[in-house]
UniProtKB/Swiss-Prot annotation:
Subunit structure: The APC/C complex is probably composed of at least 12 subunits: apc-2, apc-10, apc-11, cdc-26, emb-1, emb-27, emb-30, mat-1, mat-2, mat-3, such-1 and gfi-3.
Organism per entry: Caenorhabditis elegans
Protein name per UniProt: Anaphase-promoting complex subunit 1
Stated role: Probable component of the anaphase promoting complex/cyclosome (APC/C), a cell cycle-regulated E3 ubiquitin ligase that controls progression through mitosis and the G1 phase of the cell cycle. The APC/C complex acts by mediating ubiquitination and subsequent degradation of target proteins. Developmental role in early embryogenesis and the metaphase to anaphase transition in oocyte and spermatocyte meiosis and mitosis in germ cells. Required for embryonic anterior-posterior axis formation.
Domain of life: Eukaryota
Disruption-associated phenotype: RNAi-mediated knockdown results in defective metaphase to anaphase transition (Mat phenotype) and embryos that arrest at the one-cell stage.
Pathway: Protein modification; protein ubiquitination
Phenotypic consequence of G333R: In ax102; results in sterility
Entry keywords, A to Z: Cell cycle, Cell division, Developmental protein, Meiosis, Mitosis, Neurotransmitter transport, Transport, Ubl conjugation pathway
Gene Ontology terms: biological process: anaphase-promoting complex-dependent catabolic process; asymmetric cell division; establishment of meiotic spindle localization; metaphase/anaphase transition of meiotic cell cycle; metaphase/anaphase transition of mitotic cell cycle; neurotransmitter transport; polarity specification of anterior/posterior axis; protein K11-linked ubiquitination
Outcome of swapping M1196K: In ax76; maternal-effect lethal
Family to which this protein belongs: Belongs to the APC1 family.
Protein encoded by which gene: mat-2
Transmembrane regions listed in the UniProt entry: none
Record-linked InterPro entries: Apc1 (IPR024990), ARM-like (IPR011989)
């Protein structure tokens, strides 16, 4: 016991005053009980002599009186501790802080447990009675005088209320533990446990030691354990009667108390029960197994004889643990004596003179030196071997009185339980060897053969070095054996673990574990059972635990309160698998990495595997804050994905429109007479086709790669259409013609649109209306504002747009503003059917607006944008009212109000797109459930077929009547004139007959029909869409419409799409295939000459003339190419961005098929083509060949989206550079389309800088078809046949899929393995394959799980089996930018660990030296050892634990651990290796290592010890 004395001087002797001055605490409004206690206490116990209470009336109310005296902080603390107000502190905290339904045997931070006292419904009244009757009210019979202090103490889990009365010099100790009813009896009915009254001046409770220090009335200090006296404490400063009366005791820290008077403060340190960890664990285990009353007596007895120990002693841990073991044995009647070695031999006499001590012998000097060097090198100390060869001698006797014999069995189970706990903790193996002899001799004395044989089997070498002498008379031994219980089976923690990890064990065959296993081991077994899916897989967790652990499973695991709630939450969590639950239990049970590191290898490997495999589905990975990748990060990602080239940089240069156009004058001017200015203007006009089309591709490349600054405007790169003359480097202004200015306006529109698409979507970036208005305010060009607005709308940022600003922009009737808002607002409200947006669109559509007195002339481009927005707003809604009106718009004839009708084709095509979006995959919709009118109206599908093939207009167009119905005509008809117009409504410029104009209605009708029946496999619709089977019928069709019909047929018969030549040919009419072979010689094998060169047949004029009279070769060629391009587009749409080994093979096959047909339409001289391909290109015409080539290259790009495929990139560059700009680009009329498709293909390959891919749902497929529809515009401003702003609808059909592993510590992108598990299809097994990340994932809906990491990084597992998990993964891809945060393992290789360990020695120990040592010697020759270790190395090198780096390190250390195992632990190590081998059998990939380690265990077993 230590004490520290502090002195302080006061100017006044005011101890009596400040000791009784009340200091009212803050009243916490918890309830009536607490307020009642505080109020009544302060009202009754206030001191009449204290300041502030001069009048009696003041005694009945709460008062706070400040002390007039100045004290130090220590004095104030002591003062507060002795005031009347703080007398209630401990007790009121118990009332306030104790939760309801408090479970029994629960230890909290303050080591106070109220059991089920709080469960009693009358607990408040009971506690109130305790307070008021025992503390606060007037004395009565059996009560003590007025109490000055109250505190709670506990001793061996029993709780007591201590009431100290300074005036009466007594302390009353009331037991309150057991349960509520017992407590009530003790307090009210004078039950068995009577309160104890002790003479006491003051007392304080020491929390850590669990004792109460009492200052008696005779001024002696004593220790109490609960209500029993343990031993006295001598404190010199308090032994004087005159001085001791003035001391007051206060708790301080965990094992210290304050003794304070007016002049000094003494800090007394109470010694701990035991000092070392091993002794503490052994004593706790013994007390848990022994009877409660016996444990109480033993603890009091131990504390009474406990003395200070020498903490500097090196073998303190070992000695104190042995003392505890001998003490426990002695108190159950088994007396064990450690026979001390004989006295040291006399040393020879010295060389005369006086000697202070005898001279040491040579053997003693050698022993002392060896001990010194072993301590310096941190080696374990060698045991002292006596002359007879034994390490120690133990003498065993039995108490002849037989006291404690009945508790012997409990003590044996306590020793055995502690030995088993230490056997799985390698750090405690040395202490385990000290306890084993005492457990063995106890089992031998008790004649428990099973336990005796168990210890001999495991520790035969150790027990052979210990001499045990039994000095037990037979009659006493018979009395002893008769007193003990029948022996119970010997159990082993190793066997329990082996049973759990055995492959053949199932939840049904799992055996219940012995009840003697400690709480820490039960927790470990629970983690292993949860990891093995034995617990937690059913719906009733309590039943599983009760079946395995018994009815008291909560107590055995140590669950109560918040820990029990957390345990249930973990086990009932649906987002985690077994490994995830096991990892969470490791954290809940506070099993740290250091504890795991000292477990035996088998358990350690399983725990590390659980931690590595742990995940909570998508719950284990939460999307981080959206921080878009910086330029350096994107460069690093591109470098990791494409290590050997700079393809990303090349694509960026090809899509850069801000550089001036280089004009080489030496090439342009071919003779001196040419006008250089005219040549420059013409050259700039032609090259502007490329510049104006670059934003179409740059929108793909930069898609959602930036976050705007809210303080600055959006960055829009300059659209540079000027030139720079070479070599003079003089700038050249662009042409000033009206056509060029119009193209420049539309070019700026698409340029700003592409810049706006750089901003992230509304899911990741929030942009408000004010910022959009601020950005637009400083821009003068309406085209730039319109393109920017449309880009914001496509990204979803116009959903919260202020309608006031929208109407303000629309009221200008500017076409750029109108087009942008009508499409942008609809895109931001995609599929929502918003009423407000519907009203805006209806304003621009006469068939929705109806007759109006306003005569407003609207641009047809604006009306086209409105009808396109209508499809986006009502997409996938099946609105039959709007759908029927759109059908009429496709088929009706132009009227006088719509002249001139320059954009009529685009309007009808957009109406077809909108109709397809609204009725997507719904067929005829709800038409079958509608009551028919008296007039027979065909189904919607039939009307579209009429419009596609041709029919009278009154059979498919049913316009609502405008004028009042004619009398005596067909009454009450909703339609009049059969869709025909009156003479006043017929247009002047265009006269259409009574039949449908299929040249304008065929394409929209076909594409709408295909979308309506998408993936429905309706053979009737598919046959209607199929190309006719005769040349005559084919010649009636517009060639462009063939592409729409074939593609629509593929959409309907989606399941029949296959990447084969047979599928492509099945879509071509047989007559076309026959004529292509006969008339064009297409597909005829090329003959080769003797040298192997191709021999192309010359065109025979007679044959050509013959076939020209028989068939139109142009029809054959165009039909063939359009059918092929549509079939290839369908293949690309279905198999785009698919993953998995099988899918990759399918994608590669599909690519080769598309490439095969692409080479047919390649420009002349760019590929080796046969004569049939050349003839087909000649007869099909330039436009057909351009359209088909563009679609085939687009199909290849869609198939390889986001991959940066070099082959597709070469085809796109070929299309981009097939004609030189100095040729006549203007006259061809198709260069803008070619350049646009080339740039689109380049952008698709690098979509979002490689982060995005196309989605696979029906809406996304439809939007992709609309944005890539092969209608050839003449220029960037040409919207007559196709509304070009629809080219950007693909932005709503893509999703991020790039998985980016991100090193948290280094804040950089790293390359790791990613294992992908595909969902099983058609009843097959799941497909597993491995790739390198960063990696573009397949569609998330097709994945079952993803595992990313391994090697030096943690392995993160993401499950995608439920919709919630897929949603979280999509959030990771969008909000988190695809980043998966990985932690790098700070582990070294096994060689590094061994190297660091051997640096402690002067000489690196060799294998043979370790085995030749007396502690590790085995009788194996060097060759056998070498073969065994080489086999281990070979097996470890063959394992596949790269995904578990910590496990890999532990397996690599098996050899090192085995070499350094002492002979005393050889069998224990052999058992551990066997367990490790069984644990590795759980991994299919670790068979080699398991067999190798199993062989090592057999070799260790065969060692002759």
């Amino acid at each position: 016991m230590r004490k520290y004395v502090l002195f302080f001087i006061s100017g006044n002797n005011d101890s009596q005053i400040w000791a009784t001055t009340p200091n009212t605490p803050r009243v916490i409004a918890r309830g009536g009980l607490e307020r009642n206690i505080h109020t009544r206490t302060l009202a009754r116990m206030v001191n009449e002599d204290a300041p502030g209470t001069s009048t009696p009336a003041a005694q009945s109310r709460l008062q706070t009186t400040a002390s007039p005296f100045h004290r130090t902080h220590l004095t104030q603390m002591c003062r507060r501790g002795d005031t009347n107000a703080s007398l209630l502190r401990d007790f009121t905290r118990m009332i306030r802080d104790t939760p309801r339904n408090f479970s029994k045997n629960t230890q909290h931070g303050n080591d106070r447990d109220f059991g089920d006292l709080e469960r009693d419904p009358d607990v408040d009244l009971l506690l109130s009675k305790v307070c008021l009757e025992c503390v606060y009210v007037e004395p009565k019979e059996g009560a003590i005088p007025k109490a000055n202090k109250i505190f709670i103490s506990n001793f061996l889990s029993d709780m007591y209320i201590n009431l100290v009365s300074v005036t009466g010099e007594v302390m009353k100790i009331i037991p309150i533990w057991k349960n509520a009813e017992t407590t009530r009896k003790n307090l009210l009915e004078k039950g068995k446990h009577e309160p104890c009254v002790v003479d006491c001046v003051d007392a304080a409770f020491v929390m850590k030691s669990g004792i109460t220090v009492v200052l008696g009335s005779d001024f002696t200090t004593a220790m109490f354990g609960g209500n029993e006296r343990i031993a006295p404490i001598f404190i010199k400063e308090m032994s004087n009667q005159r001085v001791g009366r003035k001391f007051r005791l206060f708790s301080f820290a965990e094992n210290r108390i304050f003794a304070v008077n007016e002049m000094r403060c003494i800090v007394v340190e109470i010694p701990e029960t035991v000092t070392c960890k091993s002794a503490t664990e052994l004593m706790r285990t013994c007390f848990l197994h022994l009877d409660r009353d016996l444990s109480r007596k033993l603890l009091i007895k131990w504390r009474s004889v406990k003395r200070d120990v020498d903490t500097e002693r090196l073998d303190l841990d070992r000695k104190e643990m042995i003392d505890v073991a001998i003490f426990m044995l002695d108190n159950v009647g088994v007396r064990v004596t450690n026979v001390v070695a004989q006295e040291r031999a006399d040393s020879p006499e010295g060389h005369g003179g006086k000697q202070m001590r005898p001279r040491m012998s040579d053997s003693e000097v050698l022993s002392m030196m060896r001990q010194f060097f072993e301590e310096m090198t941190f080696r374990p100390k060698s045991e002292v071997i006596t002359e007879d060869g034994y390490k120690c001698h133990l003498s065993v006797e039995l108490d002849p009185n037989g006291e404690g014999f009945v508790h012997t069995q409990d003590l044996l189970h306590a020793f055995h339980s502690q030995c088993e706990d230490w056997s799985i903790n390698t750090m405690m193996h040395s202490i385990l060897l000290e306890l084993i002899p005492y457990a063995y001799l106890l089992a031998k004395v008790m004649n428990y053969r099973a336990f005796e044989e168990y210890y001999v089997q495991l520790f035969k070498h150790l027990l052979s070095q210990i001499a045990i002498e039994f000095k037990i008379p037979p009659e006493i031994h018979e009395k002893f054996v008769g007193a003990i219980h029948i022996p119970k089976p010997c159990w082993s923690l190793n066997n329990v673990i082996a049973h759990i990890i055995c492959e053949r064990t199932t939840p049904e065959t799992m055996e219940s574990i012995p009840k003697f296993i400690s709480k820490s081991s039960v927790r470990l077994l629970t983690i292993l059972a949860v990891g093995r899916k034995f617990i937690g897989m059913g719906t009733n967790i309590d039943m599983d635990c009760e079946r395995w652990l018994g009815k008291d499973w909560k107590r055995r695991i140590g669950l109560s309160g918040d820990i029990l709630k957390s345990f249930r939450r973990i086990m009932n969590g649906k987002s985690s698998n077994s490994a995830g639950r096991a990892s969470q239990l490791i954290e809940l049970f506070e099993i740290g990495s250091i504890t795991i590191d000292f477990m035996v290898l088998a358990v350690k490997v399983l725990m590390l595997k659980f931690q590595t495999d742990a995940f909570a589905g998508a719950q284990s990975i939460e999307p981080k804050k959206c921080i878009y990748a910086t330029a350096d990060e994107m460069i690093s990602i591109a470098h990791l994905r494409w290590k050997n080239d700079i393809r990303m940089h090349n694509v960026q240069l090809m899509l850069n429109s801000s550089r001036p156009i280089l004009i080489a004058t030496n090439i342009l001017r071919k003779n001196e007479d040419d006008n250089m200015k005219e040549l420059q203007d013409r050259f700039l006009t032609q090259t502007s086709y490329r510049t104006f089309s670059q934003p179409f591709g740059r929108a793909f490349l930069d898609f959602r790669t930036a976050v705007p600054s809210l303080l600055t405007s959006i960055y829009i790169p300059r659209l540079n259409v000027g030139g720079m003359i070479y070599p003079s480097r003089v700038t050249c202004d662009p042409p000033t013609t009206e056509i060029f200015k119009l193209c420049t306006e539309w070019g700026n529109f698409y340029n700003s649109l592409a810049s706006a698409l750089r901003i992230g979507s509304s899911e990741t970036v929030r942009i408000d209306n004010e910022w959009i208005v601020m950005v637009s305010k400083n821009i003068k060009s309406t085209a730039v504002i319109g393109g920017m607005t449309l880009g914001f709308g496509l990204n979803g940022h116009l959903a919260p747009f202020n309608m006031y600003h929208a109407h303000q922009m629309l009221s200008t009737f500017d076409k750029f503003h109108s087009v942008a808002l009508l499409i942008g607002l609809s895109a931001s409200n995609f599929t929502t059917c918003d009423v407000q947006i519907h009203k805006i669109l209806a304003t621009y559509l006469s068939f929705l607006m109806g007759p109006t007195p306003l005569e407003i002339k609207l641009d047809f481009t604006i009306q086209t944008a409105a009808i396109s927005g209508l499809g986006l707003l009502f997409a996938d809604s099946g609105n039959m009212t709007i759908a029927k009106k759109l059908v009429n718009e496709i088929g009706r004839a132009p009227n006088r109000d719509e002249e001139p009708v320059t954009d009529r084709n685009a309007y009808k095509l957009s109406a077809g797109f909108s109709l397809g979006l609204i009725m997507l995959g719904k067929g005829n919709g709800s038409a079958s459930t509608v009551i028919p009118f008296k007039q027979n109206i065909p189904p919607m599908s039939q009307r579209l077929i009429y419009m596609m093939n041709g029919m009278r207009r009154d059979k498919c167009v049913f316009l609502p009547q405008v004028a009042p119905p004619v009398v005596n005509d067909v009454p009450n008809l909703p339609f009049s004139n059969g869709g025909m117009m009156t003479s006043s409504q017929v247009a002047n410029h265009v006269k259409e007959s009574e039949y449908i104009n299929i040249h304008q209605s065929a394409e929209p009708a076909a594409i709408a029909l295909g979308m309506m029946f998408m993936k429905m496999n309706n053979e009737f619709i598919a046959n209607a869409l199929a190309l006719p089977g005769t040349i005559t019928e084919l010649e009636r069709l517009k060639p462009d419409s063939m592409y729409s019909r074939v593609l629509a047929q593929c959409l309907v018969m989606w399941d029949s799409i296959e990447p084969t030549h047979d599928f492509v040919k099945s879509l071509i009419p047989p007559v076309i295939r026959e004529y292509a072979t006969a008339a064009l010689h297409f597909g005829v094998p090329i003959r080769r000459d003797e040298d192997g060169e191709e021999v192309h047949e010359a065109i025979n004029d007679a044959e050509e003339k013959y076939w020209a009279e028989i068939v139109d070769k142009g029809t054959v060629s165009q039909t063939f190419l359009y059918a092929v391009s549509a079939a290839c587009m369908a293949i690309a749409l279905k198999f785009s961005s698919c993953g998995g080994p099988n899918e990759k093979n399918i994608v590669n096959t599909a690519f080769r098929i598309i490439e095969y047909y692409t080479k047919i339409v390649m420009p002349d001289g760019k590929s080796n083509k046969d004569m049939g391909s050349i003839r087909m290109c000649i007869y099909s015409g330039a436009y057909t060949r351009t359209s088909c080539l563009s679609m085939l290259i687009t199909a290849m790009a869609i198939l390889r989206v986001g991959t940066g495929d070099l082959e597709v990139m070469r085809y796109a560059r070929l299309l981009r550079l097939c004609d030189k700009p100095e040729s006549d680009w203007i006259a061809t009329g198709k260069k803008h389309f070619e350049q646009m498709v080339a740039h689109q293909a380049l952008g698709i390959l690098m979509l979002g800088e490689g982060r995005y891919a196309f989605k696979k749902d029906d809406l996304s497929i439809a939007l992709t078809i609309i944005s890539t529809f092969p209608t050839i515009p003449q220029s960037v401003s040409d919207n007559s046949h196709y509304h070009q702003p629809l080219r950007f609808l693909w932005s709503m059909a893509v999703e991020p899929r790039l998985l980016v592993p991100f090193d948290i510590a280094e804040s950089c992108v790293v390359e790791v393995d990613v294992t992908i598990v595909m969902k099983p299809k058609d009843g097959n097994e799941p497909i597993v394959y491995k790739e390198k990340a960063p990696y573009l994932l397949p569609p998330l809906e097709d994945l079952q799980s993803i595992s990313i990491g391994g090697g030096n990084y943690q392995l993160v597992h993401i499950s995608l089996q439920s919709e919630d998990q897929v949603k979280v993964m999509k959030d990771i891809m969008t909000i988190g930018q695809g980043r998966v945060m990985l932690k790098r393992y700070g582990v070294d290789s096994s060689e590094m660990k061994i190297k660091e360990a051997t640096t402690l020695y002067d000489d690196t120990p060799s294998l043979m030296s370790m085995f030749n040592n007396e502690d590790t010697a085995v009788e194996l020759d060097e060759y056998e050892i070498q073969c065994m270790m080489e086999k281990i190395d070979e097996g470890i090198n063959l394992n596949s634990s790269d995904e578990y780096p910590n496990v890999q390190i532990e397996l690599s250390c098996v050899r090192d651990v085995t070499e350094r195992t002492t002979m005393d632990l050889a069998q224990l190590q052999k058992r551990s290796l066997k367990l490790l081998s069984e644990s590795l059998d759980l991994w299919q990939d670790e068979v080699n290592v398991s067999n190798t380690i199993n062989g090592l265990a057999d070799a260790v077993q065969d060692m002759q010890i």
